[in-house]
Curated annotation (Swiss-Prot):
Entry GO terms, CC: membrane
EC number: 1.14.-.-
Keywords, alphabetical: Glycoprotein, Heme, Iron, Membrane, Metal-binding, Monooxygenase, Oxidoreductase, Transmembrane, Transmembrane helix
Reactions this protein catalyses: 2 7-demethylsiderin + NADPH + O2 = desertorin A + NADP(+) + 2 H2O
Keyword Transmembrane helix included in the entry's annotation: yes
Transmembrane segments: 12-32
Organism listed in the record: Aspergillus desertorum (Emericella desertorum)
Pfam families linked: p450
Subcellular location: Membrane
Cofactor requirements of the protein: heme
Residues bearing glycans: 149, 371
Full protein name: Bicoumarin synthase desC
Gene3D superfamilies in the record: Cytochrome P450 (1.10.630.10)
Length: 536
């Protein structure tokens, strides 16, 4: 019996030794493959200077990494390379590289069509969306362009004014018998703006229960989607499929998306059938009382003949429309919500702006008897200037104009000329352009009236007007088609908050306004505010 026990013990020891050897060997293979991937990525850039942490390894394997100030390095590279007409390369969110073109080369690049340089395909890759969402279809862009007419914009404005007034109290009103409440600013703004975005997408005829459920699901989806992207970006390429398959964050993301589709897809199919059956379908979204971006998205598909011919194709079409509706929600909530948050940080830190903007809005409301009409924002140029300066100072990224080459492209506007192979990403500086003293007087100082023209009582140029020196929405043919909607949502929600509530900083002192994540810039989520209803 003792001999048999010794044999089993020896066998277990041998098995443990073999298992340990293979685990060490697999770990060694992971590190080596990751190093080779990083080396190849850097080598593919040739002589282009690289601005990053200086490592070939993924973040999770950089055991002895040194502190890296991305914004300072990008600023240094802008003055060293971009201002002298030279490109450089920077690591972006998904862990790969993009070539940063100098502003002098951008005019030619912006004229190149999406068949050669695609933003949507770049978005799918750098934001890690392709695993759970198809963002490469141009239907959302087509639908947004279809909204750029006077009637639709007016209906959007009327609906926006109503929805912003409706969705603030549940988030910002203090509990009963309390004069004030303490809230995390970013989280609260995203909660309110998410509800507004859902209402604009689904329209006023959608059942309240569905609107509430989609709002909660889409808010969670947007948050967990970013968390999943950040998580996968930490790991070597060889391990990313395993992270997607087994990590708790990725499983949560898939579960949220599954629940959203279970509620949204039947509603989308119902609307498709209704709009197909009614000859007046083209007018369904042409009044504020029935305004729905989802209906416009469906109608745009009708007009452009993106129609299914079989039940299977119909299911796929409804699923794709669901994904695009969620993409709409992300675009109409995240960027405007970020802007609203930064504006609140500014008025809490500088209360004089709150007084000025309230006085302007009181005057703007008088002609309509205090009603929030569709044209109310046009009578508030100081608010528009304040919003535009916020976009300038607190752009959500150090770079814009992200594109990926879909086929070989020669850029002769760069010296020496660049040859872009398929899969190469490019982008251009934005934040450093906004902070350049050649473009703006005292550019590092926030001036809420920087764009206000007292002579004409206008914001000049308008907040949604892009230029080579104002780039939060990029510029040229590739500029964001939803920027008009996004800026109006930001201004309307912010001014409704300012008119309805008093805000003061709950932190002992104002923390840093924003935090860097690679090339992206987000509001600091730890800023808290004390809120009370005005007039109480």
């Amino acid at each position: 019996m003792g001999a048999l026990s010794e044999i089993f013990t020896a066998g277990y020891v041998a098995l443990a030794g073999i298992t340990g050897f293979f685990l060490v060997f697999l770990g060694f293979l992971v590190v080596i493959s990751d190093y080779i991937d990083g080396w190849r990525s850097r080598r593919a850039l040739g002589d282009i200077p690289i601005v990053d942490e200086g490592s070939n390894l993924s973040p999770i394997l950089r055991w002895n990494s040194q502190p890296y100030d991305a914004e300072a390095e990008f600023t240094r590279a802008y003055y060293k390379y971009s201002k002298n007409g030279k490109p450089f390369a920077a690591r972006i969110q998904h862990g790969g590289y993009a070539i940063v073109l100098p502003p002098s080369a951008c005019r030619k690049v912006r004229s190149i069509g999406h068949e050669q340089l695609s933003f949507l395909d770049a978005l799918a890759e750098f934001a890690d969306l392709s695993l759970h969402m198809d963002v490469t279809s141009r239907r959302v862009i087509e639908a947004t362009h279809a909204c750029n007419n006077e009637t639709t914009i007016k209906n959007f404005q009327e609906r926006l004014a109503l929805e912003c007034g409706k969705h603030l109290a549940p988030v910002f009103d203090p509990p009963q018998e309390q004069e004030s409440t303490e809230l995390k600013t970013l989280k609260s703004v995203f909660a309110a703006i998410s509800a507004v975005a859902t209402a604009l997408i689904l329209g006023p005829d959608c059942p309240e229960a569905l609107v509430s459920e989609v709002t909660a699901g889409a808010t969670a989806y947007n948050e967990v989607m970013i968390q999943c992207r950040i998580l996968r970006a930490q790991y070597p390429k060889i391990l990313k499929p395993l992270v997607w398959r087994f990590s708790r964050t990725a499983r949560e993301l898939r579960a949220i998306l599954s629940r959203l589709k279970a509620r949204l897809v039947p509603e989308i199919k119902r609307r498709i059938a209704y709009l197909e059956a009614h000859s007046t379908s083209e007018n369904q979204a042409e009044s504020a009382g029935s305004f729905s971006l989802l209906d416009i998205l469906i109608q745009t598909s009708f007009k452009n003949r993106h129609l299914p011919s079989t039940p299977v194709e119909n299911d796929k079409w409804a699923d794709l429309l669901c994904q695009q509706a969620l993409l709409y929600h992300f675009k109409l909530s995240r960027a405007p919500g970020t802007s609203v948050t930064f504006m609140l940080y500014r008025v809490m830190n500088h209360p004089e702006y709150a007084t000025m903007l309230r006085d302007e809005m009181i005057a703007a409301l008088k002609p309509s008897g205090g009603n929030w009409t569709a044209d109310i924002l046009q009578r508030a140029p100081k608010l528009e200037s304040f919003n535009k300066e916020t976009f300038r100072m607190h752009d959500i990224s150090n770079f814009v104009g992200l594109r990926v080459a879909m086929r070989p492209v020669d850029l002769r506007s760069v010296s020496p000329p660049l040859h872009l192979k398929p899969g190469t990403m490019i982008m251009t500086p934005s934040r450093t352009v906004h902070y350049d003293a050649e473009h703006y007087v005292d550019p590092l100082t926030f001036n809420g009236l920087r764009f206000y023209d007292a002579t004409s009582n206008t914001c000049t140029p308008r907040v949604f007007t892009t230029s080579p020196t104002y780039l939060p929405f990029s510029h040229g043919t590739g500029s964001c088609p939803a920027r008009n909607f996004a800026t109006q949502i930001a201004r309307m929600l912010f001014i409704r908050l300012l008119m309805g509530y008093e805000f003061e900083l709950a932190n002992e002192e104002m923390p840093a306004y924003g935090l860097m994540d690679g090339t992206a810039y987000f509001p600091n989520p730890e800023v808290r505010m004390r809120v009370r209803v005005r007039g109480k």
